Amino acid sequence: MPNYEKVEFQTLDGLTLRGRLFRAEGAGGNRTAAVVITPPYVIVQDVMVSDIAVYFSQQGITALTYDTRSFGESDGQPRCELDLSKQVDDYSDAFTFLASLPSVDPSKIGFWGISFCATVALNAAALDRRSRFVISVGPIVKASDENPYPIDKVHRVLTKALRDRESQLRGNTPFYVESTCEDGSNPTGFGPELGIEAYELVQRIAASGIAPNFSTQLTLQSFAKILRWHPMQDIKWLGETPMMLMIPGDDTVSLPEEQMRLFDMITGPKRVEVAAGKSHFNVLASEGFEGLMDMQVEFIKQTLGLSS
């Protein structure tokens, strides 16, 4: 079992987010660099990100993971409502929590994300000038101005979302949809289609029982909130914050060429690595994991001027 401490911290709007602190090994009482890590989409911290956090901690970097608001162990109502704009703010509150720890050097904290949260992490780093670095693995970039959503599908979802809003105001429960359809399509008909691999992943997690707070569903309002989120406008403000982009070479959810356009848009210090033969969801799974993680550790240590 990974060695971690259960922790919690407050957000500015009064929620309690619950996570796990993986302290840097071999620190010898010295303050260490640290990284904020969140699981993407409907995934919870029991899955996927613990291995990342353990690896960083073994390399002398403290790691904080937490369930995003309204998912897993964290507070937030309605449950399973994806609010990416609020998640951006939560990265900053997680930073503040880490910076308050006597074992962490507040001048050496950065952000990490994968898939949807890879874009959220970039957005957060662009807006929070305290972040010393950001690592983005397979960011979803289809929400950019270069890839507008079909207007007819947008209007259809907005109409349904407004009806659901009216219903909730009458005291009814929120309307929920599956996060991914069985054929891999987006349940609302617009936005990124995560593919059959995503459907199989969430079904596998649900069946395994390893994450008792996990749900395969999202509120319908989640998709209206995605529509109102425009991260590419903010990411342009990343400035001189060093960024590492890791692109899954066989990504069919967020195409490698789209991710490269994002990389080219960044004007500050940056590094790109392509994980050959890796898909969107298995980029940091099993074979090749250590090599890809070593690249990220090297990037952090070089950026912060730390010895290897």
UniProtKB/Swiss-Prot annotation:
Kindly give the Pfam families that the UniProt entry links to this protein: Hydrolase_4
- Give the UniProt keywords, A-Z: Transferase
Q: Which SUPFAM superfamilies match?
A: alpha/beta-Hydrolases
Biological or metabolic pathway of the protein: Secondary metabolite biosynthesis
**Biological-process GO terms, alphabetical:** antibiotic biosynthetic process; monocarboxylic acid biosynthetic process
* Keyword Transferase attached: yes
Q: Which InterPro entries match?
A: AB_hydrolase_fold, Hydrolase_4, Polyketide_trans_af380
Gene3D superfamilies recorded = 1.10.10.800, alpha/beta hydrolase
Q: Where is this region: Abhydrolase domain?
A: 50-280
Q: Provide the E.C. number(s) assigned to this enzyme.
A: 2.3.-.-
In alphabetical order, the GO MF annotations are: transferase activity
So what does this one do? Polyketide transferase; part of the cla gene cluster that produces clavatol and ortho-quinone methide. The clavatol biosynthesis cluster cla and the terrestric acid cluster tra are both involved in the production of peniphenones and penilactones. The non-reducing PKS claF is responsible for the formation of clavatol from successive condensations of 3 malonyl-CoA units, presumably with a simple acetyl-CoA starter unit, and 2 methylation steps.
Q: Which family does the similarity line name?
A: Belongs to the polyketide transferase af380 family.
Provide the protein name: Polyketide transferase claH
Q: Which organism is it from?
A: Penicillium crustosum
Q: Which gene encodes it?
A: claH
